[in-house]
């Protein structure tokens, strides 16, 4: 199952560019999470320590009462929680039964301590995202 999960993780921008070996290593740390329709997966304002990639089903992303996005298979959320464990910026609810790969921050951090190449790759991805976010501000 780790090989298929590694393929799912390869589609996540935070992990783009990682070797297959590193993707398999991260995949080995994931667990399957199951949420019935209507269940809260993440709650805005609460601390987050888990990253999810949806493998089956659909979910809704809300800020307050307003729906800001809809998620389906291969969509992901909570990646910033892997880095800082800060509060969730939105709520995510299962619109139908959802299955997802989940990766907990503590497991991810332990792996990073043993795999410095992964740290460098992720820092590069985050730096690129920061530059892209700052571009409109500089104009």
Predicted feature residues:
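Cytosolic regulatory regions built on CNB/CRP/Popeye-like sensor folds
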Residues: 1-139
